[in-house]
Amino acid sequence: MALVRDDFDDIPDSEIHETIVERIEGLGEMFPDALRSAVHSTVDWSIWGVKGVFSLTKSTIWVVSTTSLIAFLPYIIEKERSDLEKTQVAQQRQMLLGPSAAIQQAKTA
């Protein structure tokens, strides 16, 4: 069995620059085709699953946030308006009857 030398053997190892992708591709050739295709299929299905879960999560968050905004915003606005009216009535009462009336009403409420 004779060894055949080519030009690649004359290049020193310190001058060979290969990327990580090239190195992984070269290492992948040492595994059987069945194993490589199984790993490739598993990775593809995993990526598909993660994309699906991400898309479902985005849609769910959008539906929940817009629904809660539509449902609770009128309540929040009405409560704020009611609190403002109560504050205005208390201020008017204080102006008309003096500070003691406002304190007395606060104790009874």
UniProtKB/Swiss-Prot annotation:
Ranked from the top, the taxonomy reads: Eukaryota, Metazoa, Ecdysozoa, Nematoda, Chromadorea
Q: Principal place where this protein is found?
A: mitochondrion
This protein's membrane topology, according to the annotation, is: Single-pass membrane protein
Coiled-coil residues: none
Q: Where are the transmembrane segments?
A: 61-77
Listed under subunit, the entry gives: Forms part of the preprotein translocase complex of the outer mitochondrial membrane (TOM complex).
GO biological process assignments: intracellular protein transport
One GO term describing the cellular component: mitochondrial outer membrane
Q: Where in the cell is it found?
A: Mitochondrion outer membrane
Name of protein = Mitochondrial import receptor subunit TOM22 homolog
Q: Which residues lie on this side of the membrane: Cytoplasmic?
A: 1-60
Q: What does this protein do?
A: Central receptor component of the translocase of the outer membrane of mitochondria (TOM complex) responsible for the recognition and translocation of cytosolically synthesized mitochondrial preproteins. Together with the peripheral receptor tomm-20 functions as the transit peptide receptor and facilitates the movement of preproteins into the translocation pore.
Keywords, in A-Z order: Membrane, Mitochondrion, Mitochondrion outer membrane, Protein transport, Receptor, Translocation, Transmembrane, Transmembrane helix, Transport
The gene that this protein is the product of is: tomm-22
Question: Record's Pfam families?
Answer: Tom22
Q: Its family? A: Belongs to the Tom22 family.
State if Protein transport is listed as a keyword.
yes
